[in-house]
């Protein structure tokens, strides 16, 4: 309840600061962020609202787990805190979130090894299937849990729990405590793998890892 109230107050503060965000029938992201051709979301726009032509690393149409699930969470949060209904966006937000989840589960979930891909192209072809636990698997679990709480779609909690099960199986350091961070596609550690735990408290997990318990 406290987190919901803080979320509501924060969004209302944004509304007061920039009323344009909430004016009209739909927000910028409802109008422009939905990939109507392939599903998921397009998120790289310039200051004029046009899809960018190039990026330093990927292409503007490539889809990363972080931004795809952030969009799912955003639409879900608007539904759950009542702002979507207040501004007449409820059905649009439901559809925007659902189609994002459809694309995300179909294209990002690693059906062979479990876990999630890092990035796909616009059509959903996997470009990088490595596992980066803190920035991807854990955050997307919380975002899918938000989607479930907003819509009741059982897939949200199903895949959040599947992810958590994979993390317990592959990422948990059962000797020292904490979690390993950086994995290859098959869950073998990359050479730059990191153990996320507080050195001053042996075995204490990183805060992001612990927060998954609150969502599930």
For each of these PLM feature ranges, what is it?
Residues 1-216:
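Glycan-recognition and catalytic cores of secretory/periplasmic carbohydrate-active enzymes
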